[in-house]
């Protein structure tokens, strides 16, 4: 029984040390003025990007009559699309440092995927290119904040960025554009909630 008690005590100490090691940077900065300014500025920026994505979703709906995900699930299975992961940005098991890394990587991935939307909607080039630029700028903001916190932020050269997905038919291209925007909207919603969570600490 004594050994069990000692083992549990040791586990508690190690767990506390692990949390201190990995949670301290953001926790200590939660009340920092510059960090809070970063959060609020990029909350507004993320909200603006979400609005632009929603505008393009309406264009896809009006132009191609692709409006409901449920009707397109079977086609989605055959599309060459990947969804960046944000599991560390949900409230349960939230890890700010890892979440920042996932947001940064995901934004870069969607910046490339939006190239397919640009090809799909040439008459809306200005809006799509603005969305790509804003996505790149938000990614850069996250990267800079990671560097300010002393966290690793690996940025591959521009020539190594993923090209937009290629589709085998015009219909696949249309459905692909629909899901790129729908998935990006969900990604941004999760990123927004994560930034808002940090702003409220």
Protein language model features and the residues they cover:
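Long, contiguous alpha-helical bundle segments
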Residues: 2-181, 185-201
């Amino acid at each position: 029984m004594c050994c069990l008690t000692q083992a549990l005590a040791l586990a508690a100490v190690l767990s506390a040390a692990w949390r201190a090691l990995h949670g301290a940077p953001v926790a200590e900065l939660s009340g920092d003025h510059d960090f809070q300014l970063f959060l609020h500025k990029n909350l507004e920026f993320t909200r603006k990007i979400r609005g632009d994505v929603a505008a393009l979703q309406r264009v896809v709906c009006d132009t191609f009559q692709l409006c409901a995900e449920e009707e397109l699930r079977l086609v989605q299975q055959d599309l060459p699309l990947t969804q960046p992961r944000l599991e560390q940005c949900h409230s349960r098991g939230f890890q700010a440092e890892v979440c920042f890394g996932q947001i940064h990587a995901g934004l870069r991935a969607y910046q490339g995927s939006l190239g397919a939307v640009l090809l799909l909607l040439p008459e809306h080039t200005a809006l799509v290119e603005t969305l790509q630029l804003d996505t790149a700028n938000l990614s850069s903001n996250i990267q800079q904040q990671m560097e300010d916190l002393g966290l690793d932020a690996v940025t591959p050269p521009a020539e190594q960025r993923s090209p937009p997905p290629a589709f085998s038919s015009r219909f696949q291209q249309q459905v692909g554009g629909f899901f790129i925007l729908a998935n990006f909207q969900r990604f941004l919603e999760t990123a927004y909630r994560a930034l808002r969570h940090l702003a409220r600490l």
